[in-house]
Amino acid sequence: MARSIKKGPFIEKSLYQKVLSSFGSEKRVVIKTYSRSSTIIPEMVSLTISVYNGKTFIPIYITEDLVGHKLGEFSPTRIFRGHAKSDKKGRK
């Protein structure tokens, strides 16, 4: 179910304050966050935000196409290494 429009997008307060403080400065700073559930808002465009996936911080460069998505969508927590090969195909 989608979030109500009257509530607005969810963004963690500390992350929002970091975005606003880096918005005014010309220095390119990577913002680290654990908040995977925060929504990407238009103020974040052209910033680099590192999202924690449980092991490392994965840097994400925010573009206009990403607005409205959650930060956690772009930092996968599981690694798929493929299915095991079965040797039964060759034997008969």
UniProtKB/Swiss-Prot annotation:
Keyword annotations from UniProtKB, A to Z: Ribonucleoprotein, Ribosomal protein, RNA-binding, rRNA-binding
PROSITE patterns: RIBOSOMAL_S19 (PS00323)
One Gene Ontology CC term in the entry: small ribosomal subunit
Gene Ontology BP annotations: ribosomal small subunit assembly; translation
A GO MF label: structural constituent of ribosome
Superkingdom field: Bacteria
Keyword flag Transport: no
Pfam families in the record: Ribosomal_S19 (PF00203)
Assigned protein family: Belongs to the universal ribosomal protein uS19 family.
Summary of the function given for this chain in its UniProt record: Protein S19 forms a complex with S13 that binds strongly to the 16S ribosomal RNA.
Protein name: Small ribosomal subunit protein uS19
Native organism: Borreliella burgdorferi (strain ATCC 35210 / DSM 4680 / CIP 102532 / B31)
